[in-house]
A protein has these predicted regions:
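Catalytic cores of glycan-processing enzymes that make or break glycosidic bonds
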Residues: 97-124, 128, 175-178, 208-893
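Intrinsic disorder/low-complexity signal
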Residues: 67-69, 89, 307
């Protein structure tokens, strides 16, 4: 079998085009002009035929400098006919403008073709025409109609239908011996149920001159794209944490079994996406503080509480089983999750069912295959969890043994004959069941045309399996967070270590690639939490509590000389807290004297104080006030925090003599104390530093990482691009076809108080509120003046806004969002429910999931009605279907 590859690519001096994927090494191509490249090779093909995959790449001096888009590798079927030649004419493939249609969200769920056609039969003289057309659902197919009998003579009734064997690429093989040239044709959209052509492509006729195909030769023409004048595809969905799901059989918390019931409701209401929060194990202390889903101890292991006990087996001891049944009813009747009681009870069940079924499960073929595929993370996770409980701390640095990870020692501990093994194997058993249950939910979702959308947290815990086993990937001497924004005026301190990107780059970001690829087993779309972290991260020193003393990493700090070039005189005292007699009363009121006496000391400058030794950092203050939770202590503690962060510049953590203007300092006393000309000069350098200086630098940082990571799987990529957004973010997301997040009360345009729904980009996800925000009803009651402006200017109503968001108002706002340009409109369960006066929760405050400014938030929100009740809410479900239908979010084609 002879394969002749041909491609046009204009190279620069020293570059060469090579074929990849056909063998272990790339195959060189040849050119005489640096534009037209060819390669011919011989391949052994079995009688039944062979499918080969390949792609093109550019190399220079043996180094790959560019690859074409290869999420869908080129695919060609070679018949087993002896002495056959395939002449393959290709064009370079760039990342498609409509990349989302090539994601598994569309190809495996939304526009899936579960019953594919067979590969077309070959001819002695063949012409294969291939075209990409991903925007075609299973009830339609691509056809070709043209200027001669073999192509239907322009009669759509005689159009030649193409095969979807390699969907979203379509292909047809024509008998070239029956063709007359020149060939003219168009692609058509064929309705398989009605057996009729519904649409012709609008562009001029496609044309092919005589390619002089010889006997025993097949010409393959690929890389065509077919577009039709049909409505833009738009869908809707629901956002709800798994822990918030509630069925009649839930065990006080949502589980993977409940996820199937939520899929049923999505199908019932014609919604296409279910978006959840992270589901990884966050068990640190077994206390309610472990409820924070973004502080995981493993990026792979699922939280045991998500196990559906019903699917794990039935306890043979009927009395014990009855006790669990009673406990299930008690926990399930609670309005909010009792995290500690739920997990304690589920763990009692895990131990009993493992004792009863564990040996059989661990000996099964299914488990053995799972263990081999996942051992790399599963074994360290199981040992970490075992040692965490044995030593009563997740901080592995404090463990008397194994504080430094040693793979060989851990392997010994995991041998079945050791005393430790039963404790470790219990975690294998639980994770296997979780894997099976989520995989079943994923399969169920895909079969029903629903996408499960996961969430990838930006950080990992400093007390986690990854920090223990792979510490070289992390900077453990800093804390990740976010600068001040609408969520938190003091910024956010997540407490996560930051990434050592230089080390990660050396192995091609293998750590991230594995993480994304594992997630793709269960999800067809994902949200990148804080995508800005791939451009730069807000790193906070370990001695700080709030986020105000942080700095962007990586960044370009300023020298003293550069600062002074703006007309601002730099002084060392600007690095120290500015504490003046004049404003202490404003901060501390009746406690001013106490604060001066216990925490401050006078300097040699009149009226100027400094912090006493032992209280010079926010962490020292936090430690002093630990356990003092009365209002007065909190008032004093927070006041001391603000004193300590009242500096004008923050020293760079890496380069001595370089500085960063302190974020948001214009609100603080040190800035107010400046002369007017100094304020103007400082604002000038501040604006340059935070809004212009880093644009190109951060663009390059993101483009080192994100192209490889986002294209390592076929999941649909959605970015959480909220907060302090550098100008370069939009261009990177556009180049990589990443969906943005649009929220009306957090507009991207700084000139607008509220986002304009008709200005949202198509490539975006729009929502009313996120888990970090108040719900629509909660927001309506937070700031009456803002609500009034929204009521008059955005909704266009006259008069006084209602004090509460009525069901009618909520429905109007929901409808407006469904009418937006965004490809996806994903609303929280609470906001969907707000449109029904009978169903919605009478207690608005109970619907809030997280308050970002509260580092000790208890994540315990639950649906106040069951999924069974939801399925029976026929009037409500009818209304949602109607809203979705009339806003064009349930396209038939």
């Amino acid at each position: 079998m002879i394969l002749s590859f041909n491609i046009e690519y204009r190279t620069n001096w020293g570059e060469e085009v090579r074929l990849a994927g056909l063998s272990t090494e790339s195959v060189p191509m040849h050119t005489t002009d640096g534009i037209y490249w060819t390669a011919e090779l011989e391949l052994e093909v079995p009688q039944e035929g062979l499918t080969v995959h390949y792609n093109y790449q550019i190399e220079q001096n043996g180094i790959v400098t560019r690859k074409e888009w290869d999420n869908f590798p080129r695919c060609i079927f070679l018949s087993g006919v002896p002495r056959k030649k395939y002449r393959i004419n290709d064009c370079w493939k760039n990342i498609p403008e409509q990349l989302y249609f090539y994601s598994s969200a569309f190809t495996e769920a939304l526009l899936a073709h579960p019953e594919r056609d067979s590969i077309p039969q070959g001819h002695k003289k063949g012409l294969v025409i291939k075209a990409y057309a991903p925007r075609i659902n299973k009830n339609y197919c691509l056809g070709i109609c043209g200027n001669q009998k073999a192509l239907g003579n322009w009669n759509p009734e005689n159009a030649v239908l193409m095969s979807d064997a390699n969907f979203p690429e379509w292909q047809v093989e024509l008998n070239a011996s029956k063709l007359k040239y020149p060939l003219e044709y168009k692609f058509v959209l064929y309705n398989k149920q009605e057996k009729t052509v519904e649409c012709w492509e609008k562009n001029p006729n496609r044309y092919l001159a005589d390619p002089e195909i010889k006997t025993n030769e097949t010409l393959v023409i690929s890389d065509r794209y077919a577009y039709f004048d049909i409505p833009a595809w738009k869908g809707s969905g629901i956002a709800i944490p798994v822990f918030s799901l509630k069925s009649e059989k839930s065990f006080g918390v949502g589980d993977f079994g409940d996820l199937k019931r939520m899929i049923d409701w999505a199908v019932c209401t014609h919604q296409k996406v279910i978006q959840i929060l992270p589901i990884n194990d966050t068990t640190m202390t077994h206390a309610w503080t472990d409820s924070y889903p973004y502080n995981s101890i493993s990026i792979y292991a699922f939280h045991p509480m998500y196990a559906d006990l019903r699917q794990m087996g039935t306890l043979k001891d009927k009395e014990v089983a009855a006790g669990f049944s009673k406990k299930q009813k008690e926990l399930n009747n609670l309005t909010a999750i009792d995290y500690e009681a739920v997990n304690q009870t589920k763990w009692e069940f895990f131990r009993l069912i493992f004792r009863q079924e564990g040996e059989k499960v661990l000996a099964s073929k299914g488990f053995k295959a799972f263990f081999v595929a996942n051992k790399e993370w599963l074994q360290p996770y199981a040992v970490f969890s075992y040692l965490r409980d044995a030593y009563r701390t997740p901080n592995f640095r404090e463990w008397p043994k194994f504080s430094v990870y040693n793979a060989q020692e851990i392997e010994k501990m995991c041998q079945p004959e050791t005393a430790d093994y039963p404790h470790i194997a219990l975690y294998y058993f639980i994770q296997y069941h979780l894997h099976l249950q989520l995989l079943a939910a994923t399969k169920y979702a895909r079969e029903n045309g629903v996408v499960l959308k996961g969430d990838i947290p930006i950080g990992i815990s400093s007390n986690s399996v990854e920090a223990w086993t792979e510490p070289h990937y992390f900077n453990l001497n800093g804390q990740a967070g976010a600068p001040p924004d609408d969520f938190s005026v003091n910024g956010q301190n997540w407490g996560f270590p930051t990434y050592n990107w230089d080390v990660m780059e050396k192995d091609g970001y293998r750590w991230w690639m594995k993480r994304f690829q594992k997630m793709a087993e269960y999800f067809d779309a994902y949200r990148i939490d804080h995508i800005l972290g791939f451009f730069r991260i807000w790193e906070i020193p370990m001695h700080a509590v709030h986020g105000l003393l942080g700095q962007f990493v990586p960044s370009l700090p300023m020298s003293r000389e550069e600062i002074e070039s703006y007309g601002f005189t730099f002084r060392e005292e600007y690095l120290r807290p500015f504490i003046h007699e004049s404003f202490l009363g404003q901060l501390f009121g009746p406690y001013t004297h106490l604060v001066k006496q216990d925490f401050l000391q006078l300097t040699d400058k009149p009226g100027i104080y400094c912090m006493k030794p032992g209280f010079e950092t926010q962490q020292e203050v936090k430690q002093f006030f630990a356990g003092k939770n009365d209002e007065d202590s909190i008032w004093i503690r927070n006041g001391l925090y603000s004193l300590i962060s009242d500096v004008l510049f923050v020293p760079d953590t890496k380069e001595k003599g370089k500085y960063h203007p302190r974020i948001g300092v214009q609100r603080d006393f040190i800035f107010r104390s400046l002369a007017e000309e100094d304020k103007n000069a400082f604002n000038k350098l501040y604006d340059q530093y935070y809004y212009h200086r880093h644009n190109e630098f951060w663009f390059q940082q993101a483009m080192k990482k994100l192209p490889q990571l986002t294209q390592s799987t076929r999941m649909l990529v959605c970015g959480e691009d909220l907060g302090m957004i550098p100008a370069c973010v939009a261009s990177v997301m556009n180049d990589l076809r990443i969906l943005s997040l649009e929220i009306q009360r957090m507009p991207k345009n700084p000139m607008h108080e509220f986002g304009h729904l008709d200005e949202y980009p198509y490539r975006s996800v729009c929502t009313i509120s996120t888990h970090d925000m108040s719900t629509l009803r909660g927001w309506w009651e937070e700031d009456y003046q803002q609500t009034q402006r929204y009521y008059n200017t955005i909704l266009g109503h006259y008069g006084v806004a209602p004090a509460v968001a009525t069901p009618e108002l909520c429905e109007e706002i929901v409808r407006n969002h469904l009418n937006s340009n965004s490809i996806l409109c994903i609303l929280s369960f609470q906001d969907w429910l707000s449109i029904d006066g009978k169903l919605r929760n009478p207690n608005v405050a109970e619907e809030r999931i997280n308050v970002p400014s509260n580092p000790r938030n208890y994540w315990r929100y639950r649906m106040h009605i069951t999924l069974e009740q939801l399925m029976k809410a026929h009037a409500f479900n009818d209304k949602i279907r109607e809203l979705i239908k009339y806003t064009g979010r349930n396209p038939e084609k």
